[in-house]
Swiss-Prot record:
Residues 2-140 form the N-acetyltransferase domain. InterPro entries: Acyl_CoA_acyltransferase, GNAT_dom, N-term/lysine_N-AcTrnsfr. This is Uncharacterized protein YdhI. GO terms for molecular function: acyltransferase activity, transferring groups other than amino-acyl groups. It comes from the Bacteria. Gene3D superfamilies: 3.40.630.30. CDD domains: NAT_SF. It comes from Bacillus subtilis (strain 168). The lineage of its organism: Bacteria, Bacillati, Bacillota, Bacilli, Bacillales.
Amino acid sequence: MMIIIPNNEIAKHMLTDFFAKHWGTPEMAISSGIFRCDELDGFAAVNESGEIIGCITYTIDGKDCEIISLDSMIENKGIGTALLQQVEEKAKHAHCQRIKLITTNDNVNAIAFYQKRGYQFAAVFPNAVEKARRLKPEIPEVAENGILIRDEILFSKVID
């Protein structure tokens, strides 16, 4: 059992600890800049013990909603989908025209996940992770699956 709650209803130290545990730091570096995930709007999936088992963060800028991070600690249980649906609803209510996000070339699970949910490749930025790595040197060169972490992929979904 899980509940989805807005991040601003969770103690900030819990969010900070969650991102530090899973990303090494609450800072997310992509080529467009550095974001403090524990300070962004978002939603968390919380289990019956009160532990965060998933989290999504996003920004809204005019007609664009950008997902900055999506983490699910238990895959194939609907956590990521439930969190994504919350942001999609929020974006609709904010009259956004599209939702966009960036992932990296090594993240094959995310690439499949987003395509199954209607997101399309909008652009590929070769070697963009080098720029992000200058902002956040902790970004590894090679992923756990053995793929070089090198390119950013922009996904986009038009909101009806």
